[in-house]
Amino acid sequence: MGTIPDWFWAAVETPYEEGVVEVDECDVRWQAWGERDADKPSLLLVHGMFAHAHWWDFIAPGLLPDYRIAALDLTGMGDSDYRYEYDADTWADELRAVADAAGLGDDTIIVGHSFGGRIGLHTAVRHADRFAGLVLADAGVRDPDESLPERPPMGGRPVLYPDEETARRRFRLQPAQSCANEFLVEYIARNSVMRIDDGFAFKFDTDLMTSMSGVAHEDAERDLRALALPLGLLYGADSELFSERTLGYMRGLRDAPFPTHALADAQHHLFLDQPLAFVEALRTMLTAVRGA
């Protein structure tokens, strides 16, 4: 794995506050970094599909002390409860509830990676009075005529592993990609496994993909057209899921231009490929969005 850099240890050892808030009869876990300070701007970080708040453990501290920062486990993922059915409205309500519980101000900017960007977009429309802007991280509204890379089918009974180490070794990024920073993938894997029944499994509802609504392409397109809050976009220059064609399609859906930045040498999981460059690019983007 090679030498793990000091900045990583400093980040993941940064203390954070933890809490749980109930939304529609389900517990939603959240964590927050930095002091509660009414004079300090706030960020709400939203993970991607099948992920969790700990994906941000080595990113959020890099934005201190300038922000109060919170992240959550969307229901159906991480350590939050599972639902029988999932929908964009309820996930958006979870973001608002966490922002309130974590003491984030009305100047909060949502930062959403991948599927988290989709939920962040809907939240920024549904709860425009509670938030101040949105930054999408390799997320957006794909050109419907552009083909998607193949992904493995999901659903059915959870795969059980005999021990935690075996489960961690089976962890894979989705969509599949290489990552030179193996220590980051290993850290995420260690926080992605739970004990269930007579074995270990990954922390997500395997029925999630077949029991959610409000997240179709037409829903995302409608939300992007309706978005009134300032928007910014970061994407991996080498991403399989975000292309210049999709960027052009998104610009065509908006009446006003919005700032974008292609992160060099980064794929879909851009803050795993280039964590330090991502933090700097995000800082710059947040300044642009806050000034819009």
Give the predicted meaning of each segment.
Residues 1-20, 31:
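An N-terminal hydrophobic leader/cap segment in hydrolases
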Residues 14, 23-34, 70-111, 280:
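Active-site loop/oxyanion-hole signature of alpha/beta-hydrolase fold enzymes
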Residues 26-79:
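Conserved HGGG/HGGXW glycine-rich cap/lid loop of the alpha/beta-hydrolase fold
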Residues 112, 116, 120:
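Gly/Ala-rich beta-loop-alpha elbow adjacent to hydrolase catalytic centers
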Residues 162-218:
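Conserved alpha/beta-hydrolase catalytic His-Asp/Glu region
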